[in-house]
Structure formats: structure tokens, C-alpha cells
Amino acid sequence: MLEQVILFTILMGFLISVLLSPILIPFLRRLKFGQSIREEGPKSHQKKSGTPTMGGVMIILSIIVTTIVMTQKFSEISPEMVLLLFVTLGYGLLGFLDDYIKVVMKRNLGLTSKQKLIGQIIIAVVFYAVYHYYNFATDIRIPGTDLSFDLGWAYFILVLFMLVGGSNAVNLTDGLDGLLSGTAAIAFGAFAILAWNQSQYDVAIFSVAVVGAVLGFLVFNAHPAKVFMGDTGSLALGGAIVTIAILTKLEILLVIIGGVFVIETLSVILQVISFKTTGKRIFKMSPLHHHYELVGWSEWRVVVTFWAAGLLLAVLGIYIEVWL
């Protein structure tokens, strides 16, 4: 029965995304919600200018509808599911506002860094308030062991850092056709397996709903992309995967399973530090995926390589938690 629920969930998420896309993409095009491309980016990306963005709306709709329908068939909506849906929708709305300012108000940078940070913090604080209300654990566990450490009030700081940092890390990865869609499907798939292994079936259902939604989106987002998810999708996915890691007490393992997102973020941090301290850049461009483009790799080769890296890291994460 449970296996059937998981199968139907991923199929439903996939089909909703696939069926919504042919409706939403022309609608976004008519509204002229096209992506503007930074001039300092790779020259090969200039031809993507005008590609409909904010496609993350179809991902979020697919996740919400699929999760609610399948959860009600399996059990009642749990506090964990409420938190997952809240964070996904909250960060998705923040990303939508950022995208709207970029494409409609023609402010290419969207929300200022300060405005976006304030929004991310507010959502994280509300999340933790609800998390604390339901008396969820404030300990952090060492993957593959029974060792755990209660952080007490300091767990709030960790949650804040993870949600803000994690959503931004996933957002940075969304720079090539299909890159984030593929790596997200792999990472959420890994967490679905681990949540299932812990008998957290509601979290597993949510996770596979995301897998189905992003795979359906990937049909139209693979190179050459017909639509981009925008910050609407990337911030929502970032918030969602961090929330899953918190609810499954796999905060540390997120660094491995989400290793591609971590590496992308580190490449930006190292680039900034190097340039400010030495005046030299480590990479031709950051995040890292742009560096490989500029050394001559095709966009598709970069994407597939990062997918492969994400898959290896996901398998490693599962191995550490389940079999080590």
C-alpha cells in the first residue's frame, strides 16, 4: 500500500507539472515575463534573453496539490507537512516577488540583498516558532550513528543559518538549463529514501512529490530551455530541502546530499574573498558551473557532469546513514 502511494505521488507530481507547462509557458510569454540576461554573464547565454521565467509557479502548484491529495489518502495532514508546505510556499512567494520586480518592474537585480534577507529571516523565524510549539527536537545527530547533541536555544541559530543559507545555495545553482531541476530531483529523491527508512512517511510523500514536480518541469527546462523556474522555484526548493533535513534530523547529511549546492556556494565565497584580498580570481567566473562553460565545456556537458556528481553524493549520503 505504502509503495503504491509513493509511486502514485511521483506520477501525479510529474503529470501535473507536464500538463501545466503547455498552459503556463504561453501565458508567461504573453505577459512578457521573460528572463533578462546579465551582460557580464557568458556570451552564449545572451540568446536566452526573453525566455519565460517564474516557471517555479508550476512546480509549487504541483507540489502542493500532489502532497495534499496523496497525504489525505494516506493519513491526515501532520505538523511536519504543515511546516513543509509553509516554508515551500513562503520562500516561493518571496522568490515570486523578486522575479516580478525583475521582469515586470524592469529592475534587473530584483529585491535588494537586504530586502531578500529580511524576508528569508522572517519565514525562518515563523518556521521555528511553529517547530518549537510542536516540541520538535533541538538536537543534532551524527549521521550513521546514535550519537546526538542537544543544542537547546542554539538550535534556532542553526535553523536560521540553514534556511537562509540553504535557500540561497540552491538559488545559486540555478544558472544552466536543467541544472537545478536535475540536481534537485536527485537530492529530494535521496531524502525520500531516508525519510521512508525512518518511517516518516509524510515527509517521504512530500519529497517524492517534489521529485515528480521537478522532473515534469525538466521536460521543458532541459537544454534548450523553454522556461526557467526563476527565484520562485529555486528559493522554494531550497527552503523545502532544508526543512526536510531538519525534520528528519539529517542536518549534517544535507551537506553531503546537497553537496552540489554547497560547492556552488563555496565557489562564490572563495571567488569574492580571493578578489578582495589579492585582486585575483580563482575561477573564470562563479558560481562554478559558469567557470566550466568559460573553459570550453558545452552547457549540456556541465549539466550532466553536475548531475552525476549530485547522484554520487546522494548515494554516499544514503550509504552513510543506512549502511555505514
From Swiss-Prot:
Top-level division of the source organism's lineage: Bacteria
Membrane topology label: Multi-pass membrane protein
Annotated pathway: Cell wall biogenesis; peptidoglycan biosynthesis
Coiled coil: none
InterPro entries, sorted: Glycosyl_transferase_4, PNAcMuramoyl-5peptid_Trfase, PNAcMuramoyl-5peptid_Trfase_CS
Subcellular location: Cell membrane
Enzyme's top EC category: transferase
Keyword field contains Nuclease: no
Name of the molecule in the record: Phospho-N-acetylmuramoyl-pentapeptide-transferase
